């Protein structure tokens, strides 16, 4: 009523009326408080008044009472001697409630610790007959029976699992997929579930809690904790849950850490230490850069490398923003470098912004460029507004505004970080990156085709403003992303001639402060060494020495364009900032097609804005798929049958349509109208029928005329010999009657023996064959009859009703189950969905490969050799006679004695985590169905049933067995490929036999396993003189080639209207074959006839009817029940379906019901309680040619012929009237002939 609530303040004593009051007191304006805060404050005060204290009663009206003066003696004593303050009462720990205690007891009984070195490292829980143990938790389960179980590894979920012993299966926790938002229980209290994330207050839970279950109020497991990450005041948990189909799902927040108690150890100079606590704490990169890089290199393969890197980078840094601190400070361990660029705008050169790699695997034209310059970093720290590059031997920083990227036109910079640039570029064949440094301009161009990759089935060229969201690939800035690294190492030696000078006729090596220099001198003996201070050699010419500045305080990218350092060099790694991830992108939505319906014809008027894909398939046994790109406005026609047609236009969802038995004419009209009606429905059959009728009529007319004419001539021949002889009409008719005479059996056999002995023996063998057949039937009856009767008896005792229903979703099966002495019970079974779940075996995963080219080893004035390394498709080759230069200066003394060892191998690209294909072998599977059942008063009970003919399903008190399918069919071949959300039948090569340039050239069992196989035809080439690089040739990616030529998925070409789903791999709702059903209905569902309501004066009248339509029939049923109550209607025919099966009947009135039928003349028996009536009528064809639901159709021509058509047909070819007319015609013809002959 009011915009703000009235506050109820606590009662106060009334103001003394005799006290002095200002006649004009200032108005005190109460501070404004929002309505919600006011309500909360009001509620708090009310609760405080009611529960916390009892307020004193209000003083009576009048002057205030006099206050007593305090005694002075007491105040002095109080000042002198104060009592000690009372001891603070210790707060009692709140006891857990009943619900929490129950969950704690369940957890303690079903959760077992995992022991490692005498301490608890994590937990394993028993759920649903299996024991689950986190894979990252090492140790042994503290239970003898569970510890003896052989566990299977599921690395994708970071779990190990195994079946518990039979004696423990009854005492396990149950899981549930229902997770409504709210609070759940675990060992440390409450867990909040909101926005699909489990969170706890920060500081609750941590190392050692991995494997603990999260329970709901009923004690069911909703998740298993594996780790967590701090997010502000709360901690987000990394958990494993289950979806609605019982499939395990892993939910890991970004940056989560496993919560195993065991600390992963790292190593440095044979000393082990916790990876998150380096030994020289607070030893940081800023204090000891070389030692820090060495420590990281020695722990390159440690699974706690990220913790060590984080500790080394941030150990003395002040608190900053989390994303900036985690990401950008890592690259302070690296520096830019100068490398070879194939095209610097004029020719090949050594560029400070050389392009290492260009990746364009994201959608919407976004590319990622890796260069030799660095972005977002200055020489001494992080600054997003700057970029740094090598200006000769020194590092220089400039504003990022000087950077430019272009293809065929300038690109838009999206982000930059480390060595990487993220840009959105127009299509082009080359990528150019450059910057301006005052008057100097540095560019590098690389041949790379950039394309705008649209999402979905429409080839748009620019990101749309609005449309539909579809899955796509994007580059994102992920924090501490496991598995996406860029490989680094300490740079090799770089010659610096500025360090050499002539001093007192000798070559002097000048060492910068705090640096080391390695030198080679040949005068005439070769001398080499490392010095950290100025050094004078015995050489007299600068050309006789080479000086190399040792830079061991920074990493550089492990590039094939830089020489590798001498000796055994270790490698480091940093996180790739822009990693590909799955995301949602806006795709265009083509204008809806203008649809026109004709008889069994669908006409689509299409008006695409850009090339749009149109696919169609039939929903019958022959899919007959079509696939075409529509680039301009056009009109397409498709034939639609009763089996249905599915078409998909662009990014719109697929639509299914069915043809109705519509047509011109009327099956209940005159002959020409009936012919028009059937000609539209069955043109070929109608033409054949009409031709047959015409032929029968012509033969019927010609044959009697010719016969009568011949018989007349025979009859009047004797009279022609006598002149003026007249034949009476009656005699002429009697002459036409052919005389007959019957022979006995002996005469017939005698005739056959004398004239046709073959036919004689045939006639004799017929009785013998009949006798043999009868004897065989009697023998089979006595032998197999009792067993057959026993089987039938057992079947009848086990199941009340058996039938066969079509395997079509949405079309119900209806029947009437009768028992003697009981009223019939209506039974309805409807398939909600069907699933064929095959047994699959994942052979391997394939994806796009990435060629890794390490820095080459250049051996000056000597030879080197290759060693084998366990890398897929590893290639190594030594080239002699190389003469490399480094930024304009010679790298080696010798001219032809130098050697270079080039290496290259293949690894997974970063996109493999989101863009890969899985190769499966598919075997025979099981069929499951969800059915809705109605019997008697029990309505719509749903159940999941195995369609195998063996496994029963309980539905209420009824027992149902369905199956097996009449046709063991599956849309899958023996080998299928799953790519994204689509499935393809493809005969892929076996594991380990992939060929270069084809599907399977890169294979691994999982997306993270080390069993990588590759065959890419990688060949190393000889490097060019004067350039440090590693040229090679290689076959194009077979995975990318397969993606271009993969064809249409099974969702577009599978027959019988199958829909292909994943997790697990299965086809759904395939309308193939039929399903036997057997149901045992309990006795409680039947009603005795004496207790059944009675209805009298039944009369059924069909007022309107349209066959093959969705409840197109309307019938009226006048009723006069004994008493007003709800009764049930039962139809005895399967082809008639009632829309409503129960209805209240009044004392005197009528009931109108809708029904669906496929017959032209519906005639079905309708039973109301114990009374029955037959409903008959005529139905007209539907007016709608095409509908969006499956309609019922007659399957044979004879059942589709109306009674009117049969009547006209009988009249034409064989009715009684036809014989009468033909007899009259014959009589008239004979009479006319005799009359004209007489005269």
Swiss-Prot record:
Top EC class for this record: hydrolase
Residue numbers bearing the Phosphoserine modification: 108
A GO molecular-function descriptor: serine-type endopeptidase activity
Annotated stretches, region: Host transcription inhibition: 36-69
Enzyme active site: 136 (charge relay system), 158 (charge relay system), 210 (charge relay system)
Site note Cleavage, residues: 259-260, 322-323, 742-743, 798-799
Domain Peptidase S3, residue spans: 110-259
Annotated spans, Necessary for nucleocapsid assembly and virus assembly: 1-35
Basic residues bias locations: 79-101
Site (Involved in dimerization of the capsid protein): 184, 217
GO biological process terms held by the UniProt record: fusion of virus membrane with host endosome membrane; proteolysis; symbiont entry into host cell; symbiont-mediated suppression of host gene expression; symbiont-mediated suppression of host toll-like receptor signaling pathway; virion attachment to host cell
Outcome, altering residue 1209 to I: In strain: PE6 vaccine
Region annotation Functions as an uncleaved signal peptide for the precursor of protein E3/E2: where it falls in the sequence: 260-271
Lipidation (S-palmitoyl cysteine): 705, 715, 735-736
Outcome following mutation: residue 495 to A: In strain: PE6 vaccine
More about this protein: Belongs to the New World alphaviruses that can cause fatal encephalitis.
Protein name: Structural polyprotein
Natural source organism: Eastern equine encephalitis virus (EEEV)
């Amino acid at each position: 009523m009011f915009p703000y609530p009235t506050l109820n303040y606590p009662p106060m004593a009334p103001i003394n009326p005799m006290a002095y009051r200002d006649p004009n007191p200032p108005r005190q304006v109460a501070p404004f408080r929002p309505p919600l805060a006011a309500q909360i404050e009001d509620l708090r005060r009310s609760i405080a008044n009611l529960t916390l204290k009892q307020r004193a009663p209000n003083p009576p009206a009048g002057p205030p009472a006099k206050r007593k003066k305090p005694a002075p003696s007491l105040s002095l004593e109080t000042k002198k001697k104060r009592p000690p303050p009372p001891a603070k009462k210790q707060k009692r720990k709140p006891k857990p409630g009943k619900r929490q205690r129950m969950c704690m007891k369940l957890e303690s009984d079903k959760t077992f610790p995992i022991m490692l070195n005498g301490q608890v490292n994590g937990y394993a829980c028993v759920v649903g007959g299996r024991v689950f143990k986190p894979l990252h938790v090492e140790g042994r389960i503290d239970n003898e029976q569970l510890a003896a179980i052989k566990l299977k590894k599921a690395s994708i979920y970071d779990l190990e699992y195994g079946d518990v012993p039979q004696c423990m299966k009854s005492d396990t926790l149950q899981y549930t997929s229902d997770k409504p938002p709210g609070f759940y229980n675990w060992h440390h209290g409450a867990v909040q579930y909101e926005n699909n994330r489990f969170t706890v207050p920060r500081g609750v839970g941590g190392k050692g809690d991995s494997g603990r279950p999260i329970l709901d109020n009923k004690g069911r497991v909703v998740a298993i904790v594996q780790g967590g990450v701090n997010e502000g005041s709360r901690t987000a948990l990394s958990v494993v849950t289950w979806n609605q189909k019982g499939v395990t799902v892993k939910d890991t927040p970004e940056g989560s850490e496993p919560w195993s108690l065991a600390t992963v150890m790292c190593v440095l100079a044979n000393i082990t230490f916790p990876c998150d606590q380096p030994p020289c704490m607070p030893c940081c990169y800023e204090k000891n850069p070389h030692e820090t890089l060495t420590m990281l290199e020695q722990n390159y393969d440690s699974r706690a490398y990220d913790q060590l890197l984080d500790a080394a980078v941030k150990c003395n840094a002040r608190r900053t923003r989390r994303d900036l601190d985690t990401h950008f400070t890592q690259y302070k361990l690296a520096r830019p470098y100068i490398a070879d660029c194939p095209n610097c705008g004029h020719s090949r050169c050594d560029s400070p912004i050389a392009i290492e790699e260009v990746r364009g695997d994201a959608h919407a034209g976004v590319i990622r460029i890796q260069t030799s310059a660095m972005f977002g970093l200055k020489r001494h720290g992080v600054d997003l507004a700057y970029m740094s590059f090598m200006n000769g031997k020194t590092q220089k920083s400039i504003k990022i505004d000087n950077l430019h990227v272009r293809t065929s036109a300038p690109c838009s910079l999206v982000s930059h970080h480390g060595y990487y640039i993220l840009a959105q570029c127009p299509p082009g064949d080359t990528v150019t990156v450059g910057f301006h440094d005052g008057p100097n301009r540095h560019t590098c161009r690389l041949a790379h085709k950039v394309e705008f990759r649209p999402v979905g089935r429409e080839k748009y060229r620019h990101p749309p403003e609005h449309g539909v969201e579809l899955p796509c690939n994007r580059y994102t800035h992920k924090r501490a992303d496991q598995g996406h690294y860029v490989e680094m190492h300490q740079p090799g030696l770089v010659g610096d001639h500025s360090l050499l000078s002539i001093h007192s006729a000798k070559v002097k090596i000048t060492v910068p402060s705090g640096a080391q220099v390695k030198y080679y001198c040949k005068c005439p003996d070769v001398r080499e060494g490392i010095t950290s201070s100025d050094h004078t050699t015995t050489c007299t010419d600068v050309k006789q020495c080479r000086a190399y500045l040792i830079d061991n305080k920074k990493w550089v990218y492990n590039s094939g364009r830089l020489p590798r350092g001498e000796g055994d060099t270790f490698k480091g790694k940093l996180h790739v900032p822009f990693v590909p991830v799955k995301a949602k992108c806006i795709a265009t939505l083509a204008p809806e097609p203008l649809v026109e319906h004709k008889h069994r014809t669908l006409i689509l008027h299409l008006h695409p804005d850009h090339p749009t894909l149109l696919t169609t398939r039939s929903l019958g046994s022959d899919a007959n798929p079509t696939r075409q790109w529509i680039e301009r406005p056009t009109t397409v026609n498709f034939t639609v049958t009763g089996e249905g047609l599915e078409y998909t236009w662009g990014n719109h969802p697929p639509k299914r349509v069915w043809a109705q038995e519509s047509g011109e004419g009327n099956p209940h009209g005159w002959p020409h109208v009936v012919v028009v009606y059937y000609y539209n429905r069955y043109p070929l059959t109608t033409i054949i029928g009409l031709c047959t009728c015409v032929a029968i009529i012509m033969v019927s007319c010609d044959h009697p005329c010719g016969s009568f004419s011949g018989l007349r001539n025979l009859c009047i021949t004797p009279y022609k010999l006598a002149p003026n002889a007249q034949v009476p009409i009656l005699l002429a008719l009697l002459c036409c009657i052919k005389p007959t005479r019957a022979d006995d059996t002996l005469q017939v056999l005698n005739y056959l023996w004398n004239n046709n002995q073959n036919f004689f023996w045939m006639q004799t063998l017929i009785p013998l064959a009949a006798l043999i057949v009868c004897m065989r039937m009697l023998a089979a009856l006595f032998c197999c009859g009792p067993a057959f009767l026993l089987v039938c008896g057992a079947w009848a005792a086990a199941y009340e009703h058996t039938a066969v229903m079509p395997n079509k979703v949405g079309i119900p099966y209806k029947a009437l189950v009768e028992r003697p002495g009981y009223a019939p019970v209506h039974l309805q079974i409807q398939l909600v969905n069907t699933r064929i779940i095959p047994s699959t075996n994942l052979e391997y995963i394939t994806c796009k490969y990435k060629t890794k080219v390490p820095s080459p080893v250049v051996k000056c004035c000597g030879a080197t050799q290759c060693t084998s390394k366990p890398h897929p498709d590893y290639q190594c080759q030594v080239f002699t006679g190389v003469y490399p230069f480094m930024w304009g200066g010679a790298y080696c003394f010798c001219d032809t004695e130098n050697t270079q060892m080039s290496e290259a191998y293949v690894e997974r690209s970063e996109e493999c985590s989101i863009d890969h294909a899985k190769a499966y072998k598919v075997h025979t599977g099981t069929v499951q169905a969800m059915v809705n059942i109605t019997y008697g008063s029990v309505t719509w009970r749903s159940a999941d049933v195995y369609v195998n003919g063996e496994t029963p399903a309980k539905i209420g008190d009824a027992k149902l067995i369905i199956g097996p399918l009449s046709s063991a069919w599956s849309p899958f071949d023996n080998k299928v490929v799953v790519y994204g959300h689509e499935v393809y039948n493809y005969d892929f090569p076996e594991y380990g036999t992939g060929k270069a340039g084809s599907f399977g050239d890169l294979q691994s069992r999982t997306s993270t396993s080390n069993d990588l196989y590759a065959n890419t035809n990688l060949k190393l080439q000889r490097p060019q003189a004067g350039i440090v690089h590693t040229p090679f040739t290689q076959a194009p990616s077979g995975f990318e080639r397969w993606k271009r030529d993969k064809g249409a998925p099974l969702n577009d070409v599978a027959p019988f209207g199958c829909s292909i789903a994943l997790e697990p791999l299965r086809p759904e709702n395939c309308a193939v074959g039929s399903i036997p059903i057997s149901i045992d209905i309990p006795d409680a569902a039947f009603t005795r006839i004496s207790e059944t309501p009675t209805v009298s004066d039944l009369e059924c009248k069909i007022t309107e009817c349209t066959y093959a339509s969705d409840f197109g029939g309307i019938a009226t049923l006048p009723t006069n029940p004994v008493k007003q109550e709800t009764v049930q209607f039962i139809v005895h025919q399967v082809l008639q379906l009632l829309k409503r099966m129960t209805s209240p009947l009044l004392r005197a009135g009528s009931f109108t019901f809708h029904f669906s039928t496929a017959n032209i003349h519906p005639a079905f028996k309708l039973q109301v309680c114990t009374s029955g009536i037959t409903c008959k009528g005529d139905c007209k064809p539907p007016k709608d040619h095409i509908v969006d639901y499956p309609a019922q159709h007659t399957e044979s021509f004879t059942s589709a012929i109306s009674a009117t058509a049969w009547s006209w047909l009988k009249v034409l070819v064989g009715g009684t009237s036809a014989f009468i007319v033909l007899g009259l015609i014959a009589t008239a013809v004979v009479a006319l002939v005799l009359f004209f002959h007489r005269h």
